[in-house]
């Protein structure tokens, strides 16, 4: 298992200083999430060859590697122009990933729940254009359902991924989205089976609990989706079930700490979660 850090809470750290910081926190792997100076959210990548080369040198010097690159683009529309732009952005992001020597990219479906059928059609159109590019560059694609996306349910996401029918396209289970994707950690992981190749690890409260009043959102009846990315142990994800099931399905992929809630103590948070992962792996017979 590759235990990686999503360094989003450290996004203001210069890119070439990031690998040394990650190593100092005890991690050997990075999941490279969007940064304004490299691959921004929903915009064309900013990185040039010189920046990619400098980042590669910094990674080598720190003894840290990139496990996966995470871009977020509107490749499922529903706006056709946004979809076409997203495909262009994806092609550049794939090239940068290949230049970094990274073999995995992960992302979301990035559509809208109120236009699910139209967004799925746009998603398949993007797949027709991009699957050959992924395949040519030898890069794996890992997809996750997300709150407020056209696919939010874990099993439905597994079904769609299975329909892509490529052995290098697989499923990411995001722990802080547990209560939006069905609330069944064990069932979804086992349903995914060998398609489960990547994890996002953070805690969250169950928004459905206490008669739906764990959170109070105004105005009443709002369709807003609420979740957190907290430290392990601060929410209601059942971590014993989570790690026990990983052992049962022989998971040996990428496990990324993606806590966003504590920028004011980001170093302590990152170290704590690495320690907690090791604790639960030891408890349930897993390996890192």
Predicted regions: what is each one?
Residues 2, 29, 125-236, 285-288:
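Acidic/histidine-rich catalytic cores of soluble enzymes
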Residues 5, 22, 30, 59, ...:
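Conserved, mostly hydrophobic/aromatic
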Residues 6-10, 33-35, 71-74, 110-112, ...:
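Active-site beta-loop-alpha junctions enriched in small/polar residues
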Residues 12-22, 85-95, 181-189, 239:
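Short, acidic/polar
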Residues 16-17, 57-65, 75-173, 268, ...:
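Active-site acidic/histidine proton-transfer and metal-coordination neighborhood
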Residues 18-36:
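Catalytic domains of carbohydrate-active enzymes, especially glycoside hydrolases
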Residues 31, 68-70, 106, 142, ...:
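Conserved beta-strand positions in the central sheet of alpha/beta enzyme cores
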Residues 33-56, 110-115:
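Glycine-rich, proline-tolerant flexible connector loops at the mouths of alpha/beta enzymes
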């Amino acid at each position: 298992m590759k235990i990686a850090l999503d360094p989003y809470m450290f996004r203001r750290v210069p890119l070439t200083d990031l690998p040394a910081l990650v190593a100092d926190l005890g991690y050997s792997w990075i999941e490279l999430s969007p940064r304004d100076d490299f691959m921004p959210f929903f915009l064309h990548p900013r990185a040039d060859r010189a920046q990619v080369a400098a980042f590669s040198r910094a990674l080598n010097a720190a003894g840290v590697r990139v496990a996966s690159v995470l871009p977020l683009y509107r490749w499922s529309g529903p706006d056709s122009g946004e979809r076409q732009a997203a495909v262009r952005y994806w092609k550049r992001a794939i090239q940068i990933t290949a230049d970094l020597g990274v073999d995995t990219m992960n992302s979301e479906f990035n559509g809208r729940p109120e236009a699910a059928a139209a967004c799925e059609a746009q998603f398949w159109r993007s797949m027709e254009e991009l699957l050959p590019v992924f395949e040519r560059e030898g890069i794996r694609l890992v997809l996750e359902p997300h709150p407020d996306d056209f696919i939010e349910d874990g099993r439905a996401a597994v079904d769609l991924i299975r329909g892509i029918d490529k052995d290098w396209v697989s499923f990411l289970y995001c722990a802080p989205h547990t209560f939006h994707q069905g609330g069944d950690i064990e069932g979804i992981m086992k349903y995914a089976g060998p398609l489960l190749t990547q994890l996002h690890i953070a805690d969250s409260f169950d928004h459905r609990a206490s008669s739906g009043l764990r959170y109070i959102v105004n105005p009443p009846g709002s369709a807003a989706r609420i979740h957190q990315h907290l430290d392990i142990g601060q929410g209601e994800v059942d971590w014993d079930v989570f790690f026990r099931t990983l052992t049962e399905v022989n998971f040996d992929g990428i496990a990324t700490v993606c806590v966003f809630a504590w920028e004011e103590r980001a170093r302590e948070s990152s170290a704590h979660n690495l320690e907690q992962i090791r604790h639960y792996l030891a408890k349930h017979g897993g390996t890192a």
